[in-house]
Amino acid sequence: MPQLPVAVVSPRDTAEVQRIVTVCARRDVPITVTAGRSGVSGASVPMFGGVVLDMTAMSGVVSVDNTSGVVEVLPGTFGPDLEQALAQHNLTVGHFPQSFDISTVGGWIACLGAGQFSTRYGKINEMIVGLEIVLADGSVISTGGAPAAAHGPDASSLFVGSEGTLGVVTRAWLRAHDVAPVRKKSAYFFPSFADGVKAMREAIRAHATPAVLRLYDAVEAQRSHGGDGANSTLIVLDDGELEIVDATLAVVDRCARAHGATAAPVERVDHWLAHRNDTSGLQALTKKGFVIDTMEVAAPWSKIGAVYQGVLEATRSVDGARSVSAHVSHSYLDGACIYFTFVGQISSRDINDATTAEHQALYVAMWNAAQRAALAAGGNL
């Protein structure tokens, strides 16, 4: 169970982080590194008490190399603050996770984040030029710093995704892109989720990588976009130079229609843009006593269909499961990520009378079913 920390400390620079870490190391005091606290896996919870290191005081853009397209930024900088600073230079990092408004650069790095425009701009690990890190003994190291290297291993990669367990990121150098002059959108209905996956795979394999390429199954399309519940929906958005954007969307259109797609109102994309970070609907269900969570699974294209069907069937078989849906959120040359949402309700009696233990049991049962099915089908959590 989580424990109360003995102190919450907010360092203002690298030197203060060094002093805090050194003192804690000498006394075997555990440190939990936090910032926006938007994560849902508990990494910012002090399980062993000790000291909570709140990095939000170390915030701001230090410098911008407009010629090279590199921004030097402090770890406690929240997403909107970073993008507002870069907009003055007509630049963007292109990293827009659902937690964009309430998460920080350091958190993105620590949790190996992927933004909603990742098909074009990549995940956070692909944006990192270099890092400054305070290690567990209080020493400071710098990694990377160049566009590429002909030697290895890549030291930065040791800390990306380590969730503050191997060191404290105190500074980052990230790649920045020129703000795109053109944005275009399209949307499609598919007769089945499987048809949509085939179209996505063909587009990606043809190196058509629009900034946004998201496929919703019929259940999630209806909930997210107000569909009729009969069709899966693909939304497409691309930024860039006009010729490149037109060519990219033309390839996606060809692949979509080859698998039975029909044009959907482009307003579906506008609706997603306006509401993409809104979780109020799910939160409202939680307040009514429903059990809700999400799970993201990566799989090669050859196993995406089996993962999708396996997770849906296994989770729906749990007593109390009410809804299981999915969308493909990130695509790669060899596979994609499926983002599942499951909703459960205690069915034995009035939901308001259900105990915490019953809710926890249902939650664990749905998670166990979903995870085991995903792994059995060849997915990676």
What is each residue range found by the language model?
Residues 375-381:
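Alpha-helix capping/hinge segments and adjacent helical runs
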Residues 178, 184-192, 197-369, 377:
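C-terminal substrate-recognition/cap domain of FAD-linked oxidoreductases
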Residues 1-58, 73-75, 93-95:
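Glycine-rich N-terminal segment of FAD-binding domains in flavoprotein oxidoreductases
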Residues 35-38, 98, 215-218:
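Short, ordered loop/turn segments at secondary-structure junctions
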